[in-house]
Structure formats: C-alpha cells, structure tokens
Design a protein with these regions (language model features):
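Specific alpha-helical transmembrane segments that line the substrate/conduction pathway
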Residues: 53-56, 60, 98-136, 171-173, ...
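Glycine-/small-residue-enriched transmembrane alpha-helix faces in small-molecule transporters
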Residues: 1-53, 90, 94, 98, ...
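C-terminal-most transmembrane helix of multi-pass membrane proteins
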Residues: 2-4, 55, 59, 154, ...
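Specific transmembrane alpha-helical segments of multi-pass solute transporters/efflux pumps
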Residues: 71-111, 151, 243-261
C-alpha cells in the first residue's frame, strides 16, 4: 500500500504531465495562428517559408532561455550527449517541418489526432525488428488507427488519396517515431536530459534558420522584408507563447516528471494531448483572431472529429494497456 507521501508525489507527477499535455495541445492552434499572422504581414510567403519562420525563432529563443536557466549544467557535453542530441534534432526537425507545413492545410484537431500515429507504429517497428509478428493487440490498434485516419482525413475512396495537410501530418509522425526510438537507445541511458535538450534546441534552431535563409535567397519575399514580423505584437506574442509554454515548459515538465511513473501510465496520459488540442481549438482561434485581426474561426465538434479522434484515442489506450516488452 502506498504511503501518503508517495501517493501525493504520484498525484503531483500526473498533474505535471497533464500540464505538459495541455501545453502541447496549445501548440496546434498557436502554430496555425502564427501562420495566419505571417501570411497577413507577408502575403507573398509560401507555406514552407512560413513553416521555417515559425520554427526557427521558437528554438532560438528556447535555446537562449535554457542557456540562462541551466547555464552550469550545459557545460562540458559528452560525446554521447552530442550524438544523442544530433539524432534527436534530425528526427525532430524533419517531423516539425512536415507537421507545421501540414497544419496550414488541415485543422488543429485533425493534426493533433493524426500525429498520434507514432504510438501505434512504435510497437509495430519493435516487433518487426525482432523478426516476429506483432501480437493481436497491435493489429487491433492498427485497424482502429487506420479507420480513424480515414474518417479524420476524409479519405477519398474514389481517388484513393488524403489531403496534403493530413498526408504531411502522417509523414511527420513517422519522424517523431524515430525521435522516440532514438531517445530510448540504451547507449544513451547515462546522458543528462537538460544538456541534451539544450543542444537539440540549438541544432534545430540552426537547421531552420538555414532553411529560412535558403528559401529567402530563392524567391519572394525578400529578406529585407522579414523584420516586419518582429514589429508585429500578435506574431511576437504567439511566438513567445509557443516558446515558453509549448517548448521550454512542456519539454522541461516531461524530462523532470516522466521518469517518476511507468512508461505505460505516461503513455496513457499522453493520449490526452489531441483531446486538449481539440478543446482549445473550439475557443482559442476566435480570441486569437480578434487580437491579431485575421480570420481564424473556432473549430466545431463534427461527427468526423468525434468518430475519427475517438478511434485513434481508443487505439492508443489499447496499445498502452498491453505494452510490448522493450527490445
């Protein structure tokens, strides 16, 4: 029987991880709001430029905040920590590139639920790598996810295709799967979380700054026009919120509190991220629009969202309740 102190610690841990999921859920409508603000300020921007200009400031600021907050702990990174950071940054950068671009072509709620594909693909990958067939629970979860994807993405059965936003989100989820698998490699077990997170932020900032520079060099708008973003209070406000809450806050909470509970319980808590995203997308877009002066209507609880999101959430809960052993 747990002692009162251990029970209190467990409740606090669950609450902190729930808060991390609230922050991650907030990121979906926030990223769409940043895209609308950017398009309003620089109408000649393409979706890829908007994507890189959304992500680069986020990680530049996040790295700067961690550099001040954790300055003593960030010194003397080991070779293993640098290698882990590089792998995480590679997978995360690719995932965020497709996810953020896809968000410009689908709703925040749909993106949040489709991103959860990685929760199902990880046990499939583990089973295939071990050269064994996935167990029945994995097949059942895959069936639920495929049905949920078809409903959420309004899959066109005549042309056999998904929309651009839904397809890019599914691609991003595969890279996020790679990020999680890289994070869990046994060779990195002794690495320190905060220095690895800091270096990951630095590398992601460098990647997206370089991509933004390349896009600006190749077309409109000109680089000289970019300072208009930093003179916009709404764009700055959305970017600061994305950095403080959805980047530094969410990652710090996860790194601090997730080790205190089982992976199964943490996985179940993380299934709530798209639920929080959907709830916030019902009210925040209208508030963001009134402040920034663009048109971003509140989402509604459609039958597609309820059925598709419900199927994907059920699949994630099922796979977490019957987890596969680690390889």
């Amino acid at each position: 029987m747990p002692t009162p102190s251990s029970a209190s610690q467990h409740v606090r841990t669950v609450l902190m991880l729930l808060l991390a999921n609230v922050f991650w859920g907030l990121s979906f409508p926030l990223i769409k709001a940043i895209a609308f603000a950017h398009q309003q300020l620089l109408p000649a921007s393409g979706s890829w430029l908007i994507t890189t200009c959304t992500i680069a400031p986020r990680f530049i600021l996040a790295a700067a905040i961690l550099a001040v907050w954790q300055r003593g702990a960030l010194l003397r990174l080991t070779r293993s920590e640098i290698r882990q950071s590089a792998g995480l940054a590679l997978f995360a950068s690719a995932g965020m590139l497709f996810q953020n671009d896809g968000l410009q072509f689908t709703s925040a709620s749909t993106s949040a639920f489709l991103t959860q594909l990685y929760a199902i693909m990880i046990p499939v990958w583990v089973a295939l790598r071990a050269r064994r067939l996935p167990p029945a629970v994995v097949w059942a979860s895959c069936g639920l996810v495929l049905a949920g994807v078809a409903v959420l993405g309004r899959f066109d059965w005549r042309e056999l295709r998904l929309g651009r936003g839904e397809l890019e989100t599914l691609i991003s989820s595969l890279f996020f799967m790679g990020q999680i698998l890289w994070l869990e490699r046994r060779e990195f077990a002794g690495n320190r979380a905060m220095p690895v997170t800091f270096m990951m932020f630095v590398l992601e900032a460098a990647v997206f700054t370089a991509l933004a520079g390349a896009l600006l060099a190749g077309g409109a708008p000109r680089a000289a026009a970019m300072p208009v973003l930093f003179m916009s209070a709404p764009w700055l406000g959305f970017t600061l919120a994305l950095t403080l809450f959805c980047t530094v806050g969410a990652f710090s909470l996860m790194n601090t509190w997730q080790p205190k509970i089982t992976a199964t319980e943490a996985g179940l808590i993380y299934c709530l991220e798209p639920v929080f995203a959907s709830l916030m997308a019902l009210v925040l877009p209208g508030l963001f629009s009134r402040w920034a002066g663009f048109t971003y209507p509140n989402e509604t609880l459609t039958l597609n969202l309820l059925i598709g999101g419900g199927l994907i959430t059920a699949a994630n809960v099922l796979i977490q309740l019957k987890p596969l052993p680690k390889p």
